[in-house]
UniProtKB/Swiss-Prot annotation:
Cofactor note: Binds 1 FAD per subunit.
Protein name as annotated: Ferredoxin--NADP reductase
Cofactor(s), by name: FAD
Subunit-level organization: Homodimer.
One annotated GO molecular function: NADP binding
Enzyme kind, highest EC tier: oxidoreductase
Natural source organism: Delftia acidovorans (strain DSM 14801 / SPH-1)
Sections of the chain in a coiled coil: none
Catalytic activity from the UniProt record: 2 reduced [2Fe-2S]-[ferredoxin] + NADP(+) + H(+) = 2 oxidized [2Fe-2S]-[ferredoxin] + NADPH
Entry similarity comment: Belongs to the ferredoxin--NADP reductase type 2 family.
Length: 350
């Protein structure tokens, strides 16, 4: 899967909203039907809730896989969908979705991307995962490029003083990465106890012992800026005393939370914050829009990953009929030469 962006409207047969396990398998099933697609997700990486909340936890109910972690399942799905060459647009949400005069759907993202899609597949799970914001005075005074939420790249701290705020695995990993780039690195958290893997905690301790990372125990109370440039972070210790720490970059890793967001504003039939679908097709009440996974509701619905895989299959067959005007021929990946060609399966000459 490729991460792409552009300024011209993108024309596509299918738009998949959400890159969790259900969304990834939707890409695979659409690919088997010969339908190319683009994928949009709010997170900076694929995997959705599975990777974000259960990345290192065991999963036991995936058919044919006795046990795997969330990260391992996502990696397997990425390998499986690779032949479909889906175009990926990360760290952005679909903010608007409206019907065009020709029957297609116009989708706009929070990064200004515009897509014209013949069909749309909503696999948004429990909602888009967005970082928990730092809510202290002074945040609004900062110019762009100094306050970073869960950044995928930390090159911007090179040669500067960086403060990483948080106590989970992402915060620890970010502090370790900053130590290799920043002039000085501080890890600021409300207590001296961090939730991370043993390997990361061991590395953190090594860097603390060497002075490459300095741990500050407290809570941020205010940010100070000069002409939009971060100057210092004000923090309060356990005894209520206020202190200032000079810094040019602030990395915030306070976790993420799901928000239903714009989905509720698209005019689709909903019940208790879930989209109503026909379980035979996963179709919503809008022509060409399908929904799968935890975001949907129908009689007998179960919020399980494997149910999302089934729903993705039903949606792909229904969409193929909708887009092509006839019911698709059922073919099997074990024997179909057409499907083998799509999957890149080669057959040695006898």
């Amino acid at each position: 899967m490729q991460d792409t962006s552009g300024t011209q409207p993108i024309q596509t047969d299918a738009l998949v909203i959400g890159a969790g396990p259900a969304g990834l398998f939707q890409v695979f099933q659409l690919g088997l039907q010969g339908i190319r697609c683009h994928v949009v997700d709010a997170l900076p990486h694929v995997g959705g809730q599975c990777a974000q909340l259960y990345g290192d936890k065991p999963i036991y109910d995936i058919p044919g896989i006795p046990v795997c972690t969330g990260h391992e399942l996502v990696q397997l799905l990425q390998r499986q969908v690779a032949p479909m060459d889906a175009q990926l647009h990360l760290s952005q949400q679909v903010s608007q979705l409206q019907r065009m005069d020709d029957g297609r759907w116009l989708a706009q993202t929070t990064h200004g991307l515009e897509l014209h899609a013949r069909s749309v597949f909503i696999a948004a799970g429990v909602g888009a995962f967005v970082p928990k914001a730092l809510k202290v005075p002074g945040v609004e005074l900062l110019a762009a490029g100094q306050l970073h939420y869960h950044p995928a790249d930390l090159e911007m701290v090179r040669g500067q003083t960086a403060i990483v705020h948080g106590g989970d695995e992402e915060a620890v990993a970010a502090a370790i990465a900053c130590a290799d780039r920043a002039q000085a690195t501080y890890l600021l958290y409300r207590r001296d106890a961090f939730q991370a893997s043993a390997v990361l905690l061991e590395r953190l301790q090594e860097l603390r012992d060497s002075g490459a990372i300095r741990v500050v125990i407290g809570q941020i109370t205010q940010l100070h800026a000069d002409a939009g440039q971060l100057r210092a972070v004000q923090w309060m210790d356990g005894e209520g005393q206020e202190h200032e720490l000079a810094a040019q970059q602030l990395v915030v890793c306070l976790g993420i939370s799901p928000r239903l967001g714009p989905v509720a504003e698209w005019g689709l039939a909903m019940e208790r914050k879930q989209l109503l679908v026909n379980p035979a097709t996963q179709a919503t009440d809008a022509p060409g829009i399908y929904a799968i996974g935890d975001i949907v509701s129908y009689p007998g619905k179960h919020k399980l990953i494997l149910c999302g895989f089934h729903e993705a299959t039903m949606a792909a067959f229904a969409a193929a009929e909708y887009l092509q005007g006839e019911k698709p021929l059922l073919q099997y990946t074990t024997t179909s030469a057409r499907l083998h060609a799509i999957l890149g399966v080669s057959h040695p000459q006898a």
